[in-house]
């Protein structure tokens, strides 16, 4: 009897798992403030896209320690745009420092330049050239969001501060709207 119950339970678990595995569009954002959900207004602009839209993130592998946790947050949000774009949005993530040709194109064609950031630890202090930029491209039109557009620094006490994303969905959608309107 126990053996039959265990076998039936396993078969049911496997069956449910296979059934749920086919449901790829089920997405639930349980974060505080729904930081990975895209608003209806953003979805409206994404539905206006007729040609492929490129969202390219330029992020350095080596950056300031306070900036590092923001990179995955931006990448996750950009992935949400790709999903909401229903095949009309192509995303790329590039570290220009690792590829000289890509860095040259970013600098010359799009005006994307690294930001010098001071990093220090217990034993040394150094300047790191870091990329934290988003390129929105539509046809021949493009818009670049840089460090100043995406990041907000908040004071915490006299000497401490916090670096957070300002309002990334608004900034990305505003840039998409701008390139869509300029393209027309």
What would you call each of these model-derived segments?
Residues 1-184:
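Short, surface-exposed patches at the edges or C-terminal ends of soluble domains, predominantly
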């Amino acid at each position: 009897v126990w053996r039959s119950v265990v076998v039936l339970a396993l078969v049911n678990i496997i069956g449910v798992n296979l059934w749920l595995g086919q449901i790829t569009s089920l997405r639930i954002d349980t974060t505080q403030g729904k930081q990975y959900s895209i608003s209806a207004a953003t979805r409206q602009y994404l539905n206006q896209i007729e040609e492929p839209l490129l969202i390219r993130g330029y992020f350095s592998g080596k950056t300031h320690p306070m900036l590092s946790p923001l990179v995955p947050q931006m990448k996750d949000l950009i992935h949400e745009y790709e999903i909401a774009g229903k095949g009309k949005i192509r995303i790329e993530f590039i570290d220009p420092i690792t590829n000289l040709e890509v860095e040259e194109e970013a600098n010359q064609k799009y005006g994307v330049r690294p930001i010098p950031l001071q990093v220090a630890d217990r034993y040394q202090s150094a300047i790191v050239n870091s990329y934290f930029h988003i390129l929105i491209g539509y046809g021949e039109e493009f818009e670049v969001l840089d460090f100043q557009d995406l990041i907000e620094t908040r004071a915490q006490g006299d000497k401490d501060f916090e670096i957070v994303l300002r309002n990334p969905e608004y900034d990305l959608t505003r840039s998409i709207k701008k390139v869509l309107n300029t393209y027309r």
